[in-house]
Amino acid sequence: SQKSFIYNINAGKLSQDHWVKDPKIGGGRIIGEICHFLDLLVFLTGEKIVNFSISSMDDSLEDCFIITLNFKDGSVACINYFSNGHPKVEKENLKIFTEGKYLEMNNFLKINGYGWKNFSKKTFFYQQKGHKECIHKFLHSVKNGLDSPVELDELIHVSELSIEINNALRK
């Protein structure tokens, strides 16, 4: 089913000499950070991104921008990536709207839901970003000769898209 996403990232300000901003080390904020948000959205939809647009604030090319995404199944997403927010506001907030239902994830610590049978909220004691689970699944697949838990074409799709978005921002 089609989904609508609003993904707010309160990224925080980085100095110009920060390693993330170095194209040779961190790749810049799109290559080094946005790729993860794209990957999550592709995972949640199960679909490839077929179109995007990007807009940035004139004076902060790589620190404050909005990316809109269209997915093959008609789902849409908006990634709001800002470094000009207050540091006490959560870094990541993802809102998902689908079939009269709503989910909201705050900083990978809390999930609230409306319209879901037998679910309304879940709170974690520490951030649950899936790193441990991903490593476990990868090692399990290698050990047992299974396919990769993430399809190669999905990894390539997100990587190529990250480069395309980065190039579009710099035009």
List the predicted regions and their residue ranges.
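Short, well-ordered secondary-structure micro-motifs
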Residues: Q16-H18, V89-E92, W116
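C-terminal helix-rich "cap/oligomerization" subdomain common to oxidoreductases
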Residues: K72, K137-K171
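Contiguous beta-strand/loop segments that form the cofactor/metal-binding neighborhood of enzyme cores
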Residues: G32, L38-K110, K132-L146
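Short coil/turn segments
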Residues: N8-N10, F108, Y126-H131
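Short, solvent-exposed polar/charged micro-motifs at secondary-structure junctions
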Residues: L14-H18, S60-I66, E160-L161
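Interdomain hinge/lid region at the active-site interface
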Residues: N112-T123, G130-K137
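Predominantly a Rossmann-like dinucleotide-binding segment in NAD(P)-dependent oxidoreductases
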Residues: S1-S55
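A short glycine-threonine-serine/GTX helix/turn-capping micro-motif
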Residues: I25-G32, S120-K129
